[in-house]
Every structure is written in C-alpha cells, then in structure tokens.
C-alpha cells in the first residue's frame, strides 16, 4: 500500500512539474496568449491583444502588454504588466483570496458622447453581466492582501462638453502618476476591512496633486470606523486619529450619489 501511495504521489508531482515546465516554454506561452486573446475578443466583440501570458506554480499569472480597444476601434486599455498570485485552497469554500496583485504601466481612456449616453466601457460590463432573469444574491467573500499600482494614467471625457484649460473639470479628467498600495483584508456583502497605505495622484488640467492619502477603514451595514486618516497636498496636511459614522443601512449612502 505504501508503495502504491508513493507511486501515486510521484505521478501527481511529475504531472505538476511537467505542466509548469510546459507552460514556461516561450512558444507555448505565445500560443496561449493568442488563444486567450481570441476568446476574449469573441466574448467582448472588440479587438484585444496580449503579448505574453506566464503561469508560475499554477497559482500565479503574469500578463504582459495587454491592449483592448473599445467598440469604436480606439484604444481603451493598455497595460504593461498585470500579475496576480492567489491561494487555491480558499476557492473550494467559495472564497477568493489573492495574496498579491500588481498593475504596472497602465493607460485607461474612458469616454461617453453626451452625459446621458453609455460610456465606452459599457460593452465590457454587458459581456460579463449575468444572463439570468432571476436575480440571485451573491455571497461576496474577497481578500486581497496587497494591491500595488505604479505608473498609471486614466483619462475621462464627456465629448459633448467644453474643455476648460487650467481648471478642474469633472467632464474632462486627466489623472496621471497614479501610485497606490492597498490592502483589502476582507470584503463581504455587508462589511469591509481595508487599508490604503498610500495613494497619490496628479490631475493634469488643473495642476491638482494628491501627494499622499492613507487610512484604514472597518465597517458593516450599520457603522463605520476610519482610523489613521492622513492626507498630504503640496501646501496642506491633515491628519485625524479616528472617525466614527453610524447609519441605518448601506442604502443611506445612495443619497450621496
């Protein structure tokens, strides 16, 4: 019996190592990148290309040179590198536990024709939306230990609205030099435990600069606590130890939208 167990373990280990070696062959990675890009292009009905996909130890995926056009044929998303490392065991209990996500060198271009029109990324939301006519409540259980963002740019335009050079305009935003280090300890349907260790952003048109924002937030459907809040602007700094908020339900925040 012991010999049989050793044989089985040896076969499983051999298959595991063989799969890892196979997925790290450059030609296999190229074929996999083309296959995944074609499948996503079919789902999204838009052009998408992927330079390389690298899967390491079957729980880490690295995607290089991702490019997605909107349905008008203009570049909507460009990412130099996206990598994620996740824990496999929590998946069997319906939980998503990601130990690390890295998003480096990205450029996102969002727009809509008029304030009432749908945005150019609506087709992505529609493609992955549930087709069930009966609405089911999803039990969200997500953990991201570390989310690192570097060298990010985001633009947003309502094309029918006038630009205002030198002034902040929510209809024409140019965010650049986005840097973030975020930890999401727990996110469920009615609770959150997260920390923004660092967030910095510049707005190109107005010259606004958020040098650093940091805080820790713990909340549920009736109360929220924000700790270690600190914000640094070029000529202003503000820090608060603890902020408490009480409310009847999460629906109370709908009035702020």
Which residues make up each language-model segment?
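Short extracytoplasmic
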Residues: 42-65
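Short, solvent-exposed coil/turn segments at beta-strand boundaries
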Residues: 58-59, 188, 217-223
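Contiguous, well-ordered beta-strand patches that form the walls/edges
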Residues: 207-212, 218
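Transmembrane beta-strand segments that form the barrel wall of outer-membrane beta-barrel proteins
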Residues: 197-199, 223-230
């Amino acid at each position: 019996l012991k010999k049989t167990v050793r044989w089985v373990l040896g076969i499983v280990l051999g298959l595991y190592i063989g799969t890892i070696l196979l997925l790290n062959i450059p030609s296999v990675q190229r074929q996999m990148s083309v296959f995944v890009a074609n499948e996503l292009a079919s789902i999204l009905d838009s052009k998408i290309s992927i330079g390389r996909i690298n899967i390491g130890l079957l729980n880490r995926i690295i995607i290089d040179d991702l490019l997605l056009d909107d349905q008008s044929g203009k570049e909507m998303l460009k990412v130099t590198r996206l990598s994620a490392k996740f824990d496999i065991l929590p998946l069997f209990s319906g939980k998503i536990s990601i130990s690390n996500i890295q998003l480096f060198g990205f450029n996102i271009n969002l727009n809509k024709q008029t304030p009432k029109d749908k945005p150019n990324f609506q087709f992505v939301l529609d493609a992955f939306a549930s087709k069930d006519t009966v609405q089911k409540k999803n039990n969200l259980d997500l953990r991201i230990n570390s989310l690192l963002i570097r060298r990010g740019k985001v633009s947003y335009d309502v094309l029918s609205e006038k630009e205002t050079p030198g002034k902040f305009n929510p209809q024409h935003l140019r965010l650049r030099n986005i840097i973030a280090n975020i930890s999401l300890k727990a996110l469920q349907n009615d609770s959150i435990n997260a920390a923004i260790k660092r967030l910095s952003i510049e707005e190109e048109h107005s010259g606004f600069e958020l040098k650093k924002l940091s805080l820790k937030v713990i909340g549920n459907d009736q109360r929220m606590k924000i700790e270690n809040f600190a914000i640094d602007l070029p000529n202003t700094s503000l820090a608060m130890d603890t902020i408490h908020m009480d409310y009847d339900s999460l629906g109370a925040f709908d009035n702020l939208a």
